[in-house]
């Protein structure tokens, strides 16, 4: 096997780990701020709250797995809502997601200086934490405009280091400070915490699962979504549960709740400006608080402080960057569906990045949130958007199952568990998850006036703008899906930036990939090499087929990628299971809003009986594609 082929096979094996690492880097980073924010409300019941929120997260992860496998496109709950309901519901879900990303950027950037305060103490207090947080946001926006890309290998390394560090703290904590007696004494039911604070802490704990949307956003780059996405989500869930079901017990054992002057206090929930028992509060750097209260030697504690300060700030920086990328991607997608003006799709002439979307939603608005300097507000505003969009996602999956029962759609993957009643496979995970997130949303709206006005105001402003834009500018119904037109014409005839190339085991495919690379190379375009596995009607779409079909499909995509490497063009491989190859090609091109499909076809002898000129699949694509189609006919045999 050639060196190139060995390297490509290694990269293919790293598909699921890379997807897991990126998702865990976003979800796992939230432990560095969620622990302190939740403790403000839950006090001694913080571990119980994380368990309850974890069960809701498990249901939500199952929902996102099924929806993303079915519709492997960026958008998450917005995409699910578009297919299950209509464009108006999709917009509201997307607008709530936008709030999630904005809050993620603000809260992650704000907590970076607090962990770096191990090097300079003023960073943990105003105004330096706000100033440094704003600098982080500005730097991330500039880096994303220039187009700096993350390395999958670095993400894997950081995810492993992050998980190993958190696991080490858990093990040390259980050995040195864990005490069931202390944990029991921490709780005064109905008093510390009060019932209202306890119920409010559950939606706030959703902050701990920041980044589940990342899986959906990365699905477009996953080679085989049906296989890699469920595995990656499962690994993320296991890793997250392992930490969130253990570290809070250690934290409350190390920093117990005390009754002082009529108030119940724990260092874990106090802001850094307040002091208790000779220490400042650790609300804004809770994991550092765990390190400082494990009872380790001064030298070992100091080493751990420095190591954790560097690691946590790096993970939070990457988490904030994921928010910036997510905000720009969802803005770009919303513009593509005419939910926002096309100006947000404007690409920088030099760097080819959506710079307006990055500046507005990745920079300006997060900076406004950061100026508040209130971690409780930042956490609650994220919980508002998250519970709303999660509830829409659960409802969309339930709706899809009902459509499937009526024969409207075919679902390639079903998450567990399900209950079949009257011909419908009701998704129990979506039902229970929807109840959990829906009730959590109501709790936030009812109990927190500031979030009620800010969150509902955000949704209302977005809705009013959407109505105005749709009726006065687009002149389209609110519920109709409208795609942005693809720029076609003499001036841009050869400026193809998104090319779909179906590949099969014929030399015509090699000619098609070669032609596509020549079209894309001048404009830094990307190519989607698509291979369709046609599944017989008597088998489910996720059935394993005989004859090493999947291995052959992966080999095809490796060959296409090798051709792209020779041209310096990024080739993204995608395996799709479908009943008909032609329909799958058309759907994939429309989903990605591709500008052209390049297909290889054999030359046919026209002296025989009449039939399709290039073959049934090519003719179907020519008749039904929403974009241009170019056919690369193979040269005649000598």
Residue ranges and their predicted role:
Residues 5-6, 123-127, 156, 160-305:
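Helix-loop-helix junctions that connect adjacent transmembrane segments
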Residues 11, 87, 127-134, 223-244, ...:
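Loop-to-transmembrane helix boundary motifs in multi-pass membrane proteins
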Residues 154, 343-355, 390-445:
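C-terminal membrane-solvent junction of multi-pass transporters and transport-like membrane proteins
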Residues 488-547, 563-565, 569-572, 624, ...:
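Small/aliphatic-rich secondary-structure junction motif
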Residues 599-623, 638:
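Glycine-rich, Arg-bearing micro-motifs that act as flexible, cationic patches
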């Amino acid at each position: 096997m050639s060196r190139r082929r060995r390297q490509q096979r290694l990269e293919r094996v790293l598909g699921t780990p890379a997807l897991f690492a990126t998702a865990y880097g976003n979800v796992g980073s939230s432990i560095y701020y969620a622990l302190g924010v939740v403790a403000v409300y839950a006090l001694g019941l913080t571990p119980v709250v994380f368990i309850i929120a974890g069960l809701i997260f498990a249901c939500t992860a199952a929902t996102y797995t099924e929806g993303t496998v079915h519709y492997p496109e960026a958008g998450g709950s917005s995409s699910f809502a578009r297919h299950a309901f209509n464009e108006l519901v999709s917009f509201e879900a997307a607008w709530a997601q936008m709030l999630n990303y904005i809050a993620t950027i603000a809260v992650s950037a704000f907590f970076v200086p607090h962990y770096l305060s191990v090097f300079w103490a003023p960073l943990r207090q105003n105004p330096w934490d706000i100033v440094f947080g704003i600098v982080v946001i500005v730097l991330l926006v500039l880096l994303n405009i220039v187009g700096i890309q993350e390395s999958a290998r670095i993400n894997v390394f950081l995810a492993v280091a992050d998980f190993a560090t958190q696991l080490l703290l858990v093990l040390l904590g259980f050995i040195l400070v864990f005490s069931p007696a202390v944990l029991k004494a921490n709780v005064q039911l109905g008093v510390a915490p009060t019932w209202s604070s306890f119920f409010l802490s559950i939606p706030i704990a959703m902050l701990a699962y920041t980044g589940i949307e990342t899986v959906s956003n990365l699905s477009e780059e996953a080679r085989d979504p049906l296989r890699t996405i469920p595995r990656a989500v499962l690994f993320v869930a296991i890793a997250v549960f392992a930490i969130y079901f253990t570290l809070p017990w250690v934290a409350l054992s190390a920093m117990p709740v005390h009754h002082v002057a009529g108030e119940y206090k724990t260092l874990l929930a106090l802001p850094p400006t307040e002091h208790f028992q000779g220490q400042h509060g650790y609300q804004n750097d809770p994991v550092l608080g765990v390190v400082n209260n494990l009872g380790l030697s001064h030298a070992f504690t100091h080493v751990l402080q420095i190591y954790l300060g560097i690691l946590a700030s790096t993970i939070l920086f990457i988490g904030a960057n994921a928010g910036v990328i997510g905000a720009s991607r969802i803005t770009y997608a919303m513009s593509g569906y005419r939910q926002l003006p096309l100006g947000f799709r404007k690409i920088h002439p030099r760097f080819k990045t959506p710079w307006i979307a990055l500046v507005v939603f990745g920079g300006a608005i997060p900076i406004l949130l950061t100026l508040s300097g209130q971690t409780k507000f930042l956490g609650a505003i994220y919980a508002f958007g998250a519970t709303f969009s999660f509830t829409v996602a659960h409802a969309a999956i339930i709706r899809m199952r009902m459509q499937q029962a009526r024969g409207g759609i075919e679902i390639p993957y079903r998450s567990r568990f399900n209950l079949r009643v009257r011909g419908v496979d009701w998704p129990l995970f979506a039902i229970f998850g929807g109840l959990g997130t829906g009730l959590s949303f109501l709790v936030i709206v009812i109990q927190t006036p500031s979030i009620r006005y800010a969150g509902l105001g955000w949704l209302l402003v977005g809705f009013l703008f959407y109505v105005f834009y749709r009726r006065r500018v687009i002149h389209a119904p609110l519920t109709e899906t409208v795609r942005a037109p693809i720029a076609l014409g003499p001036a841009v005839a050869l400026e193809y930036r998104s090319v779909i190339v179906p590949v099969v085991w014929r030399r015509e495919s090699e000619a098609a990939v070669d032609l596509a690379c020549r079209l894309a190379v001048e404009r830094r375009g990307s190519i989607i090499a698509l291979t369709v596995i046609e599944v017989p009607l008597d088998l489910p779409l996720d059935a394993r087929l005989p004859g090493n079909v999947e291995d052959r499909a992966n080999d095809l995509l490796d060959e296409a990628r090798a051709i792209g490497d020779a041209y310096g063009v990024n080739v993204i491989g995608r395996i799709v299971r479908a009943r008909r190859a032609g329909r799958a090609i058309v759907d994939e091109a429309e989903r990605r809003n591709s500008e052209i499909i390049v297909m290889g076809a054999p030359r046919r002898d026209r002296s025989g009986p009449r039939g399709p000129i290039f073959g049934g699949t090519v003719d179907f694509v020519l008749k039904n594609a929403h974009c241009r189609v170019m056919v690369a006919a193979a040269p005649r045999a000598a």
